Protein backbone atom coordinates (compact mmCIF):
# COMPACT_ATOMS: atom_id res chain seq x y z
CA UNK A 1 0.00 0.00 0.00
CA UNK A 2 1.48 3.30 -0.99
CA UNK A 3 2.40 6.08 1.29
CA UNK A 4 -0.56 8.33 1.76
CA UNK A 5 -0.43 12.11 2.15
CA UNK A 6 -1.15 13.46 5.60
CA UNK A 7 -2.90 16.57 4.28
CA UNK A 8 -5.83 14.77 2.67
CA UNK A 9 -8.26 12.14 3.73
CA UNK A 10 -8.73 8.67 2.23
CA UNK A 11 -11.16 10.02 -0.28
CA UNK A 12 -8.78 12.80 -1.34
CA UNK A 13 -10.44 15.77 0.35
CA UNK A 14 -8.29 18.43 1.87
CA UNK A 15 -7.92 18.12 5.63
CA UNK A 16 -7.94 20.75 8.29
CA UNK A 17 -4.42 21.66 9.43
CA UNK A 18 -5.27 20.60 13.02
CA UNK A 19 -6.37 17.17 11.84
CA UNK A 20 -3.29 16.87 9.76
CA UNK A 21 -1.07 17.49 12.83
CA UNK A 22 -3.01 14.94 14.92
CA UNK A 23 -2.72 12.33 12.18
CA UNK A 24 1.03 12.74 11.85
CA UNK A 25 1.46 12.43 15.62
CA UNK A 26 -0.52 9.20 15.62
CA UNK A 27 1.55 7.82 12.82
CA UNK A 28 4.75 8.47 14.66
CA UNK A 29 3.30 6.80 17.75
CA UNK A 30 2.44 3.63 15.89
CA UNK A 31 5.86 3.44 14.40
CA UNK A 32 7.46 3.86 17.79
CA UNK A 33 5.21 1.19 19.32
CA UNK A 34 6.08 -1.23 16.60
CA UNK A 35 9.74 -0.74 17.18
CA UNK A 36 9.18 -1.20 20.86
CA UNK A 37 7.35 -4.43 20.34
CA UNK A 38 10.12 -5.76 18.16
CA UNK A 39 12.66 -4.94 20.80
CA UNK A 40 10.57 -6.74 23.44
CA UNK A 41 10.27 -9.81 21.28
CA UNK A 42 13.99 -9.87 20.59
CA UNK A 43 14.69 -9.51 24.28
CA UNK A 44 12.34 -12.40 25.08
CA UNK A 45 14.00 -14.59 22.45
CA UNK A 46 17.41 -13.77 23.79
CA UNK A 47 16.30 -14.75 27.26
CA UNK A 48 15.29 -18.23 26.07
CA UNK A 49 17.90 -21.06 25.92
CA UNK A 50 17.87 -22.89 22.56
CA UNK A 51 19.45 -26.03 24.16
CA UNK A 52 16.61 -26.20 26.65
CA UNK A 53 14.16 -26.02 23.78
CA UNK A 54 15.96 -28.99 22.16
CA UNK A 55 15.75 -30.95 25.41
CA UNK A 56 12.05 -30.24 25.71
CA UNK A 57 11.46 -31.49 22.20
CA UNK A 58 13.48 -34.67 22.99
CA UNK A 59 11.28 -35.32 26.01
CA UNK A 60 8.23 -34.99 23.86
CA UNK A 61 9.71 -37.42 21.35
CA UNK A 62 10.52 -39.98 24.04
CA UNK A 63 7.01 -39.66 25.34
CA UNK A 64 5.56 -40.14 21.89
CA UNK A 65 7.86 -42.95 20.70
CA UNK A 66 7.81 -45.06 23.85
CA UNK A 67 6.80 -48.65 22.83
CA UNK A 68 6.37 -49.82 26.42
CA UNK A 69 4.27 -47.12 28.04
CA UNK A 70 1.44 -45.15 26.58
CA UNK A 71 2.12 -41.37 26.40
CA UNK A 72 0.60 -39.31 29.18
CA UNK A 73 -0.55 -36.61 26.76
CA UNK A 74 -2.76 -36.85 23.76
CA UNK A 75 -1.22 -37.13 20.32
CA UNK A 76 -2.68 -33.76 19.23
CA UNK A 77 -1.37 -32.02 22.35
CA UNK A 78 2.09 -33.47 21.73
CA UNK A 79 1.98 -32.28 18.14
CA UNK A 80 0.99 -28.70 19.13
CA UNK A 81 3.65 -28.50 21.80
CA UNK A 82 6.32 -29.67 19.43
CA UNK A 83 5.16 -27.14 16.81
CA UNK A 84 5.42 -24.22 19.22
CA UNK A 85 8.83 -25.29 20.45
CA UNK A 86 10.03 -25.67 16.93
CA UNK A 87 8.81 -22.15 15.94
CA UNK A 88 10.47 -20.63 18.97
CA UNK A 89 13.69 -22.38 18.14
CA UNK A 90 13.47 -21.10 14.56
CA UNK A 91 13.01 -17.49 15.72
CA UNK A 92 16.01 -17.79 17.97
CA UNK A 93 18.02 -19.18 15.10
CA UNK A 94 16.96 -16.27 12.85
CA UNK A 95 17.72 -13.79 15.58
CA UNK A 96 21.22 -15.12 16.03
CA UNK A 97 21.63 -15.37 12.31
CA UNK A 98 21.40 -11.55 12.05
CA UNK A 99 23.19 -10.69 15.25
CA UNK A 100 25.71 -13.53 15.89
CA UNK A 101 26.53 -15.91 13.02
CA UNK A 102 28.74 -18.19 15.24
CA UNK A 103 25.90 -18.91 17.63
CA UNK A 104 23.72 -19.53 14.61
CA UNK A 105 26.07 -22.29 13.40
CA UNK A 106 26.07 -23.99 16.81
CA UNK A 107 22.31 -23.93 16.92
CA UNK A 108 22.10 -25.52 13.49
CA UNK A 109 24.36 -28.40 14.67
CA UNK A 110 22.11 -28.95 17.68
CA UNK A 111 19.13 -29.11 15.39
CA UNK A 112 20.78 -31.76 13.18
CA UNK A 113 21.65 -33.93 16.19
CA UNK A 114 18.11 -33.68 17.44
CA UNK A 115 16.70 -34.73 14.09
CA UNK A 116 19.03 -37.76 14.00
CA UNK A 117 17.96 -38.94 17.45
CA UNK A 118 14.34 -38.40 16.61
CA UNK A 119 14.66 -40.57 13.49
CA UNK A 120 16.29 -43.39 15.49
CA UNK A 121 13.54 -43.28 18.08
CA UNK A 122 10.92 -43.37 15.38
CA UNK A 123 12.52 -46.39 13.68
CA UNK A 124 12.84 -48.30 16.95
CA UNK A 125 9.25 -47.56 17.85
CA UNK A 126 7.99 -48.67 14.46
CA UNK A 127 10.04 -51.89 14.52
CA UNK A 128 8.77 -52.86 17.96
CA UNK A 129 5.20 -52.14 17.05
CA UNK A 130 5.50 -54.05 13.80
CA UNK A 131 7.08 -57.01 15.58
CA UNK A 132 4.19 -57.09 18.01
CA UNK A 133 1.54 -56.88 15.35
CA UNK A 134 3.02 -58.96 12.53
CA UNK A 135 2.92 -62.77 12.29
CA UNK A 136 6.06 -64.83 11.97
CA UNK A 137 4.94 -66.55 8.79
CA UNK A 138 4.41 -63.27 7.00
CA UNK A 139 8.02 -62.13 7.48
CA UNK A 140 9.83 -62.56 4.16
CA UNK A 141 13.08 -64.45 4.34
CA UNK A 142 16.16 -62.70 3.01
CA UNK A 143 17.61 -63.93 -0.22
CA UNK A 144 20.93 -65.74 -0.29
CA UNK A 145 23.65 -63.15 -0.65
CA UNK A 146 25.87 -63.54 -3.64
CA UNK A 147 29.50 -64.44 -3.17
CA UNK A 148 31.73 -61.36 -3.31
CA UNK A 149 33.50 -60.90 -6.57
CA UNK A 150 36.89 -60.75 -4.87
CA UNK A 151 36.79 -64.53 -4.28
CA UNK A 152 37.13 -66.37 -7.55
CA UNK A 153 35.73 -69.80 -6.85
CA UNK A 154 35.97 -70.84 -10.48
CA UNK A 155 39.73 -70.31 -10.49
CA UNK A 156 40.41 -72.70 -7.63
CA UNK A 157 41.41 -76.01 -9.23
CA UNK A 158 39.40 -79.03 -8.24
CA UNK A 159 41.32 -82.02 -6.88
CA UNK A 160 42.42 -84.62 -9.35
CA UNK A 161 41.40 -88.24 -9.59
CA UNK A 162 40.47 -89.80 -6.30
CA UNK A 163 42.87 -92.47 -5.08
CA UNK A 164 41.81 -95.93 -6.19
CA UNK A 165 39.95 -98.19 -3.81
CA UNK A 166 41.93 -100.85 -2.02
CA UNK A 167 39.43 -103.45 -3.21
CA UNK A 168 40.16 -102.86 -6.88
CA UNK A 169 42.91 -104.66 -8.74
CA UNK A 170 45.83 -102.99 -10.41
CA UNK A 171 44.30 -103.49 -13.85
CA UNK A 172 41.33 -101.38 -12.83
CA UNK A 173 43.57 -98.61 -11.55
CA UNK A 174 44.67 -97.47 -14.96
CA UNK A 175 41.12 -97.42 -16.27
CA UNK A 176 39.82 -95.45 -13.31
CA UNK A 177 42.58 -92.87 -13.50
CA UNK A 178 42.19 -92.41 -17.24
CA UNK A 179 38.44 -92.01 -16.89
CA UNK A 180 38.85 -89.48 -14.10
CA UNK A 181 41.39 -87.52 -16.14
CA UNK A 182 38.94 -87.45 -19.04
CA UNK A 183 36.15 -86.35 -16.72
CA UNK A 184 38.27 -83.49 -15.39
CA UNK A 185 39.02 -82.11 -18.84
CA UNK A 186 36.24 -79.55 -18.51
CA UNK A 187 37.48 -78.11 -15.21
CA UNK A 188 38.56 -74.47 -15.71
CA UNK A 189 42.24 -73.81 -15.20
CA UNK A 190 43.89 -70.90 -13.43
CA UNK A 191 44.68 -67.79 -15.44
CA UNK A 192 48.21 -67.31 -16.65
CA UNK A 193 49.32 -64.88 -13.95
CA UNK A 194 47.72 -66.57 -10.94
CA UNK A 195 49.09 -69.14 -8.58
CA UNK A 196 46.83 -71.73 -7.00
CA UNK A 197 46.51 -71.80 -3.21
CA UNK A 198 49.20 -73.88 -1.55
CA UNK A 199 48.78 -76.75 0.88
CA UNK A 200 47.75 -76.03 4.46
CA UNK A 201 50.52 -75.39 6.97
CA UNK A 202 52.06 -78.30 8.80
CA UNK A 203 52.86 -81.85 7.73
CA UNK A 204 50.21 -83.95 6.00
CA UNK A 205 48.09 -86.15 8.27
CA UNK A 206 49.22 -89.77 8.68
CA UNK A 207 46.14 -91.10 6.88
CA UNK A 208 47.12 -89.22 3.72
CA UNK A 209 50.70 -90.45 4.00
CA UNK A 210 49.59 -94.07 4.35
CA UNK A 211 47.14 -93.67 1.48
CA UNK A 212 49.79 -92.31 -0.88
CA UNK A 213 52.29 -94.89 0.32
CA UNK A 214 49.84 -97.72 -0.39
CA UNK A 215 49.05 -96.27 -3.82
CA UNK A 216 52.74 -95.96 -4.65
CA UNK A 217 53.47 -99.54 -3.65
CA UNK A 218 50.45 -100.85 -5.53
CA UNK A 219 51.49 -99.07 -8.70
CA UNK A 220 55.06 -100.31 -8.38
CA UNK A 221 53.96 -103.93 -7.88
CA UNK A 222 51.51 -103.80 -10.80
CA UNK A 223 53.97 -102.07 -13.11
CA UNK A 224 51.44 -99.47 -14.17
CA UNK A 225 52.69 -96.09 -15.38
CA UNK A 226 49.34 -94.37 -14.82
CA UNK A 227 49.64 -90.84 -13.49
CA UNK A 228 47.55 -90.57 -10.30
CA UNK A 229 47.75 -86.85 -9.64
CA UNK A 230 46.04 -84.19 -11.76
CA UNK A 231 48.08 -81.44 -13.40
CA UNK A 232 46.11 -78.68 -11.67
CA UNK A 233 47.54 -79.58 -8.24
CA UNK A 234 50.19 -77.42 -6.74
CA UNK A 235 53.77 -78.45 -7.40
CA UNK A 236 54.64 -77.91 -3.74
CA UNK A 237 51.97 -80.35 -2.61
CA UNK A 238 53.25 -82.82 -5.23
CA UNK A 239 56.78 -82.65 -3.93
CA UNK A 240 55.62 -83.06 -0.34
CA UNK A 241 53.50 -86.08 -1.24
CA UNK A 242 56.43 -87.62 -3.16
CA UNK A 243 58.81 -87.13 -0.26
CA UNK A 244 56.37 -88.63 2.19
CA UNK A 245 55.66 -91.57 -0.12
CA UNK A 246 59.41 -92.19 -0.44
CA UNK A 247 59.70 -92.22 3.31
CA UNK A 248 56.86 -94.69 3.40
CA UNK A 249 58.67 -96.96 0.94
CA UNK A 250 61.71 -96.96 3.20
CA UNK A 251 59.64 -98.00 6.24
CA UNK A 252 59.94 -101.47 7.72
CA UNK A 253 57.69 -104.48 7.27
CA UNK A 254 55.89 -103.67 10.51
CA UNK A 255 54.40 -100.57 8.91
CA UNK A 256 53.14 -102.71 6.04
CA UNK A 257 51.54 -105.10 8.51
CA UNK A 258 49.79 -102.21 10.26
CA UNK A 259 48.64 -100.90 6.86
CA UNK A 260 47.27 -104.32 6.05
CA UNK A 261 45.40 -104.38 9.35
CA UNK A 262 43.85 -101.01 8.60
CA UNK A 263 42.91 -102.15 5.12
CA UNK A 264 41.29 -105.21 6.60
CA UNK A 265 39.26 -103.07 8.97
CA UNK A 266 38.14 -100.84 6.10
CA UNK A 267 37.30 -103.90 4.05
CA UNK A 268 35.20 -105.30 6.86
CA UNK A 269 33.37 -102.01 7.19
CA UNK A 270 32.68 -102.06 3.47
CA UNK A 271 31.51 -105.65 3.70
CA UNK A 272 29.00 -104.69 6.35
CA UNK A 273 27.35 -102.28 3.92
CA UNK A 274 27.75 -104.07 0.61
CA UNK A 275 27.36 -107.65 1.80
CA UNK A 276 30.41 -108.74 -0.23
CA UNK A 277 33.62 -110.11 1.18
CA UNK A 278 37.06 -109.79 -0.36
CA UNK A 279 39.69 -111.89 1.34
CA UNK A 280 43.34 -112.26 0.44
CA UNK A 281 44.99 -115.61 0.83
CA UNK A 282 48.09 -114.31 2.61
CA UNK A 283 46.16 -112.15 5.06
CA UNK A 284 45.41 -113.65 8.48
CA UNK A 285 41.93 -113.16 9.80
CA UNK A 286 41.75 -110.11 12.09
CA UNK A 287 41.67 -110.79 15.82
CA UNK A 288 38.39 -109.18 16.53
CA UNK A 289 35.25 -110.33 18.23
CA UNK A 290 32.82 -111.73 15.69
CA UNK A 291 29.31 -113.03 16.04
CA UNK A 292 28.87 -116.07 13.87
CA UNK A 293 25.72 -118.01 13.16
CA UNK A 294 26.38 -121.43 11.65
CA UNK A 295 23.25 -122.74 10.02
CA UNK A 296 23.80 -126.11 8.37
CA UNK A 297 20.56 -127.73 9.40
CA UNK A 298 19.05 -130.55 7.48
CA UNK A 299 16.40 -131.21 10.14
CA UNK A 300 14.00 -128.87 11.87
CA UNK A 301 14.52 -127.75 15.47
CA UNK A 302 11.46 -129.76 16.49
CA UNK A 303 12.99 -132.94 15.06
CA UNK A 304 16.26 -132.21 16.83
CA UNK A 305 14.39 -131.63 20.07
CA UNK A 306 12.54 -134.93 19.71
CA UNK A 307 15.81 -136.72 19.01
CA UNK A 308 17.36 -135.19 22.11
CA UNK A 309 14.37 -136.02 24.29
CA UNK A 310 14.31 -139.61 23.02
CA UNK A 311 17.99 -140.07 23.79
CA UNK A 312 19.16 -140.24 20.21
CA UNK A 313 22.31 -138.47 19.12
CA UNK A 314 21.89 -135.44 16.92
CA UNK A 315 24.64 -135.06 14.27
CA UNK A 316 26.88 -132.10 14.88
CA UNK A 317 26.42 -130.66 11.42
CA UNK A 318 22.69 -130.41 12.17
CA UNK A 319 23.15 -128.14 15.14
CA UNK A 320 22.70 -124.41 14.97
CA UNK A 321 25.29 -122.62 17.02
CA UNK A 322 25.31 -118.94 17.64
CA UNK A 323 28.34 -118.11 19.66
CA UNK A 324 30.70 -115.24 20.20
CA UNK A 325 34.06 -116.62 19.27
CA UNK A 326 37.47 -115.15 19.67
CA UNK A 327 39.81 -116.27 16.95
CA UNK A 328 43.25 -117.44 18.11
CA UNK A 329 42.09 -117.72 21.73
CA UNK A 330 43.26 -120.29 24.22
CA UNK A 331 39.73 -121.10 25.33
CA UNK A 332 38.71 -122.38 21.93
CA UNK A 333 41.85 -124.52 21.71
CA UNK A 334 41.13 -125.97 25.13
CA UNK A 335 37.56 -126.73 24.13
CA UNK A 336 38.73 -128.37 20.92
CA UNK A 337 41.19 -130.53 22.83
CA UNK A 338 38.53 -131.47 25.35
CA UNK A 339 36.05 -132.31 22.60
CA UNK A 340 38.45 -134.88 21.15
CA UNK A 341 38.85 -136.55 24.54
CA UNK A 342 35.12 -136.44 25.37
CA UNK A 343 34.08 -140.07 24.60
CA UNK A 344 36.49 -141.44 27.19
CA UNK A 345 34.56 -140.28 30.29
CA UNK A 346 31.37 -141.66 28.81
CA UNK A 347 32.47 -145.27 29.05
CA UNK A 348 34.21 -144.88 32.38
CA UNK A 349 32.50 -147.34 34.73
CA UNK A 350 33.97 -145.81 37.88
CA UNK A 351 31.63 -142.92 38.39
CA UNK A 352 31.15 -141.40 41.85
CA UNK A 353 27.93 -141.72 43.76
CA UNK A 354 25.26 -139.12 42.97
CA UNK A 355 26.11 -136.90 45.91
CA UNK A 356 29.78 -136.60 45.02
CA UNK A 357 30.76 -133.51 43.02
CA UNK A 358 33.16 -133.73 40.13
CA UNK A 359 35.46 -130.98 41.31
CA UNK A 360 38.44 -133.30 41.41
CA UNK A 361 37.97 -134.41 37.83
CA UNK A 362 37.80 -130.96 36.28
CA UNK A 363 40.47 -128.25 36.17
CA UNK A 364 39.41 -124.86 37.49
CA UNK A 365 39.80 -123.27 34.07
CA UNK A 366 36.87 -125.32 32.79
CA UNK A 367 34.55 -124.30 35.60
CA UNK A 368 33.52 -121.19 33.74
CA UNK A 369 30.61 -121.92 31.50
CA UNK A 370 31.39 -121.23 27.85
CA UNK A 371 28.62 -119.54 25.88
CA UNK A 372 26.31 -122.25 24.64
CA UNK A 373 22.93 -122.20 23.00
CA UNK A 374 19.76 -124.13 23.51
CA UNK A 375 19.02 -125.38 27.05
CA UNK A 376 20.53 -123.79 30.16
CA UNK A 377 24.06 -124.78 31.18
CA UNK A 378 24.75 -127.89 33.18
CA UNK A 379 26.50 -126.26 36.11
CA UNK A 380 23.42 -125.27 38.13
CA UNK A 381 20.40 -127.55 38.47
CA UNK A 382 18.47 -127.56 35.22
CA UNK A 383 16.03 -124.75 34.48
CA UNK A 384 12.27 -125.44 34.54
CA UNK A 385 11.43 -128.26 32.13
CA UNK A 386 8.85 -128.31 29.36
CA UNK A 387 10.77 -125.62 27.52
CA UNK A 388 11.11 -126.26 23.77
CA UNK A 389 14.62 -125.64 22.46
CA UNK A 390 13.82 -123.15 19.76
CA UNK A 391 16.35 -121.41 17.54
CA UNK A 392 18.85 -119.47 19.61
CA UNK A 393 18.42 -115.73 19.86
CA UNK A 394 20.30 -113.26 21.98
CA UNK A 395 23.22 -113.82 24.33
CA UNK A 396 24.04 -117.28 25.71
CA UNK A 397 21.36 -118.30 28.19
CA UNK A 398 21.96 -118.89 31.84
CA UNK A 399 19.68 -119.67 34.77
CA UNK A 400 16.30 -117.95 34.95
CA UNK A 401 16.44 -114.16 35.38
CA UNK A 402 15.11 -114.18 38.90
CA UNK A 403 17.00 -117.23 40.12
CA UNK A 404 18.62 -117.03 43.56
CA UNK A 405 22.41 -116.90 43.74
CA UNK A 406 22.73 -120.63 44.40
CA UNK A 407 21.18 -121.44 41.02
CA UNK A 408 23.81 -119.53 39.04
CA UNK A 409 26.83 -121.23 37.49
CA UNK A 410 30.00 -120.88 39.56
CA UNK A 411 32.06 -119.11 36.90
CA UNK A 412 29.42 -117.27 34.94
CA UNK A 413 29.40 -113.50 35.59
CA UNK A 414 26.14 -111.72 36.02
CA UNK A 415 26.72 -109.65 32.87
CA UNK A 416 26.44 -112.74 30.65
CA UNK A 417 22.98 -113.62 31.91
CA UNK A 418 20.86 -112.04 29.22
CA UNK A 419 17.19 -112.47 28.41
CA UNK A 420 15.99 -115.94 27.57
CA UNK A 421 15.26 -116.82 23.92
CA UNK A 422 12.09 -115.41 22.50
CA UNK A 423 10.35 -118.75 21.92
CA UNK A 424 10.81 -119.96 25.51
CA UNK A 425 8.24 -119.35 28.26
CA UNK A 426 9.34 -117.16 31.15
CA UNK A 427 11.10 -118.77 34.06
CA UNK A 428 10.10 -118.62 37.71
CA UNK A 429 9.27 -115.15 39.02
CA UNK A 430 12.10 -113.19 40.61
CA UNK A 431 12.42 -113.24 44.31
CA UNK A 432 11.06 -116.72 44.98
CA UNK A 433 12.16 -118.37 48.23
CA UNK A 434 15.05 -120.80 47.90
CA UNK A 435 13.60 -124.24 47.57
CA UNK A 436 14.41 -127.57 46.03
CA UNK A 437 16.16 -127.44 42.68
CA UNK A 438 14.10 -128.02 39.57
CA UNK A 439 13.49 -131.54 38.42
CA UNK A 440 11.13 -133.33 36.04
CA UNK A 441 7.46 -133.39 37.03
CA UNK A 442 6.41 -137.03 36.90
CA UNK A 443 3.18 -137.91 35.28
CA UNK A 444 3.16 -135.48 32.41
CA UNK A 445 1.77 -136.86 29.15
CA UNK A 446 4.21 -137.53 26.31
CA UNK A 447 4.44 -135.30 23.33
CA UNK A 448 5.15 -131.59 22.97
CA UNK A 449 4.97 -129.61 26.18
CA UNK A 450 1.65 -127.89 26.97
CA UNK A 451 1.40 -124.14 26.47
CA UNK A 452 0.15 -123.36 29.93
CA UNK A 453 1.57 -121.18 32.68
CA UNK A 454 5.20 -122.04 33.38
CA UNK A 455 5.71 -124.40 36.33
CA UNK A 456 6.91 -122.61 39.40
CA UNK A 457 9.07 -125.41 40.82
CA UNK A 458 9.31 -128.74 39.00
CA UNK A 459 8.93 -131.68 41.37
CA UNK A 460 11.63 -134.22 42.00
CA UNK A 461 11.19 -137.59 40.40
CA UNK A 462 10.07 -140.60 42.41
CA UNK A 463 12.86 -143.01 43.21
CA UNK A 464 13.96 -145.17 40.37
CA UNK A 465 12.65 -143.16 37.43
CA UNK A 466 15.48 -142.46 34.96
CA UNK A 467 15.08 -139.42 32.72
CA UNK A 468 15.88 -139.80 29.03
CA UNK A 469 19.50 -140.61 28.26
CA UNK A 470 21.57 -137.70 27.00
CA UNK A 471 22.99 -137.47 23.47
CA UNK A 472 26.67 -138.31 22.99
CA UNK A 473 28.81 -135.68 24.61
CA UNK A 474 31.91 -133.94 23.35
CA UNK A 475 33.92 -131.70 25.60
CA UNK A 476 35.28 -131.51 29.14
CA UNK A 477 33.19 -132.91 32.00
CA UNK A 478 30.83 -130.45 33.58
CA UNK A 479 31.07 -129.69 37.26
CA UNK A 480 28.04 -129.33 39.49
CA UNK A 481 28.01 -126.68 42.22
CA UNK A 482 29.12 -127.96 45.63
CA UNK A 483 26.62 -128.85 48.28
CA UNK A 484 27.40 -125.76 50.34
CA UNK A 485 25.86 -123.50 47.71
CA UNK A 486 22.37 -124.76 48.42
CA UNK A 487 20.55 -123.33 51.47
CA UNK A 488 18.51 -125.64 53.69
CA UNK A 489 14.98 -126.31 52.41
CA UNK A 490 11.75 -125.31 54.01
CA UNK A 491 10.22 -128.79 54.17
CA UNK A 492 12.09 -131.75 55.67
CA UNK A 493 10.09 -134.32 53.70
CA UNK A 494 11.01 -133.24 50.15
CA UNK A 495 12.87 -135.81 48.14
CA UNK A 496 16.20 -135.00 46.56
CA UNK A 497 17.04 -136.49 43.21
CA UNK A 498 20.63 -136.11 42.06
CA UNK A 499 21.03 -137.82 38.69
CA UNK A 500 24.04 -139.87 37.79
CA UNK A 501 25.11 -141.40 34.50
CA UNK A 502 25.44 -145.15 34.50
CA UNK A 503 26.30 -147.16 31.39
CA UNK A 504 23.38 -149.01 29.96
CA UNK A 505 25.42 -151.96 28.73
CA UNK A 506 26.60 -153.99 31.71
CA UNK A 507 27.86 -157.44 32.41
CA UNK A 508 25.34 -160.07 33.38
CA UNK A 509 26.68 -160.16 36.90
CA UNK A 510 26.24 -156.47 37.38
CA UNK A 511 22.78 -156.59 35.90
CA UNK A 512 21.80 -159.41 38.20
CA UNK A 513 23.13 -157.50 41.20
CA UNK A 514 21.06 -154.47 40.33
CA UNK A 515 17.96 -156.29 39.31
CA UNK A 516 15.95 -155.14 42.27
CA UNK A 517 16.56 -151.43 41.89
CA UNK A 518 16.03 -151.49 38.16
CA UNK A 519 12.89 -153.47 38.47
CA UNK A 520 11.02 -150.58 40.06
CA UNK A 521 12.61 -147.89 37.86
CA UNK A 522 10.71 -145.83 35.34
CA UNK A 523 12.74 -146.27 32.19
CA UNK A 524 12.46 -144.37 28.92
CA UNK A 525 11.70 -146.46 25.84
CA UNK A 526 13.07 -145.18 22.55
CA UNK A 527 10.66 -143.36 20.28
CA UNK A 528 8.86 -145.42 17.67
CA UNK A 529 10.90 -146.14 14.60
CA UNK A 530 14.24 -145.96 16.39
CA UNK A 531 16.31 -148.44 18.32
CA UNK A 532 17.74 -147.78 21.70
CA UNK A 533 21.43 -147.06 21.76
CA UNK A 534 23.03 -149.75 23.93
CA UNK A 535 26.03 -147.57 24.69
CA UNK A 536 24.03 -144.46 25.60
CA UNK A 537 24.31 -143.72 29.31
CA UNK A 538 21.19 -143.67 31.42
CA UNK A 539 20.62 -140.90 33.94
CA UNK A 540 19.17 -142.17 37.17
CA UNK A 541 17.77 -139.99 39.91
CA UNK A 542 18.27 -141.28 43.39
CA UNK A 543 15.84 -140.05 46.01
CA UNK A 544 17.26 -139.28 49.42
CA UNK A 545 15.20 -138.03 52.33
CA UNK A 546 17.23 -136.57 55.13
CA UNK A 547 16.30 -137.20 58.69
CA UNK A 548 15.56 -134.35 61.03
CA UNK A 549 18.58 -135.17 63.15
CA UNK A 550 21.07 -134.87 60.30
CA UNK A 551 19.55 -131.63 59.06
CA UNK A 552 19.17 -129.90 62.39
CA UNK A 553 22.56 -128.31 61.96
CA UNK A 554 21.37 -126.61 58.78
CA UNK A 555 18.20 -125.02 60.05
CA UNK A 556 16.07 -127.95 61.07
CA UNK A 557 15.22 -129.16 57.55
CA UNK A 558 16.46 -131.80 55.17
CA UNK A 559 19.19 -130.78 52.77
CA UNK A 560 18.04 -131.10 49.19
CA UNK A 561 20.72 -131.68 46.59
CA UNK A 562 20.32 -132.33 42.91
CA UNK A 563 23.60 -132.83 41.16
CA UNK A 564 23.47 -133.61 37.47
CA UNK A 565 26.51 -135.74 36.78
CA UNK A 566 26.59 -135.00 33.06
CA UNK A 567 29.76 -134.90 31.07
CA UNK A 568 29.64 -132.56 28.10
CA UNK A 569 29.09 -128.79 28.48
CA UNK A 570 29.51 -127.95 24.80
CA UNK A 571 26.52 -129.70 23.29
CA UNK A 572 22.94 -129.13 24.33
CA UNK A 573 21.93 -129.98 27.87
CA UNK A 574 19.84 -133.04 28.57
CA UNK A 575 16.26 -132.10 29.27
CA UNK A 576 14.70 -134.08 32.06
CA UNK A 577 11.45 -134.30 30.08
CA UNK A 578 10.06 -137.82 29.71
CA UNK A 579 8.51 -138.54 26.35
CA UNK A 580 7.01 -141.85 27.45
CA UNK A 581 6.98 -143.55 30.83
CA UNK A 582 6.68 -147.24 31.49
CA UNK A 583 6.20 -148.46 35.05
CA UNK A 584 7.90 -151.76 35.75
CA UNK A 585 6.44 -153.52 38.74
CA UNK A 586 8.16 -156.12 40.82
CA UNK A 587 7.58 -159.50 39.30
CA UNK A 588 8.06 -161.34 42.58
CA UNK A 589 5.92 -159.32 44.97
CA UNK A 590 2.98 -157.31 43.60
CA UNK A 591 2.79 -155.01 46.59
CA UNK A 592 3.41 -151.98 44.38
CA UNK A 593 5.92 -150.58 46.84
CA UNK A 594 8.91 -148.92 45.33
CA UNK A 595 12.16 -150.22 46.58
CA UNK A 596 14.84 -147.80 47.51
CA UNK A 597 17.64 -147.54 45.02
CA UNK A 598 21.16 -147.79 46.24
CA UNK A 599 24.35 -147.01 44.37
CA UNK A 600 25.84 -149.86 42.38
CA UNK A 601 28.67 -151.80 43.84
CA UNK A 602 31.20 -150.38 41.41
CA UNK A 603 30.50 -146.76 42.41
CA UNK A 604 32.59 -145.86 45.41
CA UNK A 605 32.22 -142.74 47.52
CA UNK A 606 35.36 -140.59 47.26
CA UNK A 607 37.33 -139.98 50.41
CA UNK A 608 36.95 -136.19 50.23
CA UNK A 609 33.15 -136.36 50.03
CA UNK A 610 30.98 -136.51 53.10
CA UNK A 611 28.91 -139.70 53.47
CA UNK A 612 25.47 -139.44 51.89
CA UNK A 613 22.46 -138.69 54.02
CA UNK A 614 20.56 -141.69 55.29
CA UNK A 615 17.92 -142.99 52.95
CA UNK A 616 14.31 -143.37 53.95
CA UNK A 617 11.56 -145.20 52.11
CA UNK A 618 8.97 -143.17 50.27
CA UNK A 619 5.39 -143.02 51.55
CA UNK A 620 3.59 -146.23 50.64
CA UNK A 621 0.43 -144.53 49.39
CA UNK A 622 2.09 -142.81 46.37
CA UNK A 623 1.66 -145.57 43.84
CA UNK A 624 1.06 -143.95 40.49
CA UNK A 625 2.70 -141.02 38.80
CA UNK A 626 -0.49 -138.94 39.01
CA UNK A 627 -0.63 -139.36 42.76
CA UNK A 628 3.05 -138.45 43.05
CA UNK A 629 2.50 -135.32 41.00
CA UNK A 630 -0.58 -134.30 43.01
CA UNK A 631 1.30 -134.80 46.25
CA UNK A 632 4.17 -132.74 44.97
CA UNK A 633 1.91 -129.91 43.85
CA UNK A 634 0.26 -129.85 47.29
CA UNK A 635 3.71 -129.77 48.84
CA UNK A 636 4.77 -126.89 46.59
CA UNK A 637 1.61 -124.95 47.43
CA UNK A 638 2.50 -125.31 51.07
CA UNK A 639 6.02 -124.09 50.41
CA UNK A 640 5.12 -121.15 48.22
UniProtKB/Swiss-Prot annotation:
What role does it play? Activates pre-mRNA splicing.
Q: Locate the Phosphoserine modifications and list their residues.
A: 285
Keyword Nucleus carried by entry: yes
Q: Where is the composition biased (Polar residues)?
A: 1-11
Q: Where is the composition biased (Basic and acidic residues)?
A: 230-240, 252-274, 586-599
> Which spans does this entry mark as compositional bias, Basic residues?
28-37
**What keywords sit in the KW lines?**
Coiled coil, Cytoplasm, mRNA processing, mRNA splicing, Nucleus, Phosphoprotein, rRNA processing
- Motif placement: PGR: 421-432
Residue stretches of biased makeup (Gly residues): 547-558
Species the sequence originates in = Danio rerio (Zebrafish)
Q: What is this protein called?
A: WW domain-binding protein 11
Q: Which InterPro entries match?
A: WW_dom-bd_prot_11 (IPR019007)
Location within or outside the cell? Cytoplasm; Nucleus
User: What's an example GO BP annotation here?
Assistant: RNA splicing
Q: Which PANTHER family does this one have?
A: WW DOMAIN-BINDING PROTEIN 11 (PTHR13361:SF1)
Query: Composition bias, kind Low complexity: at what positions?
Result: 356-371, 603-616
Write down the superkingdom of origin.
Answer: Eukaryota
Give the primary localization class. cytoplasm
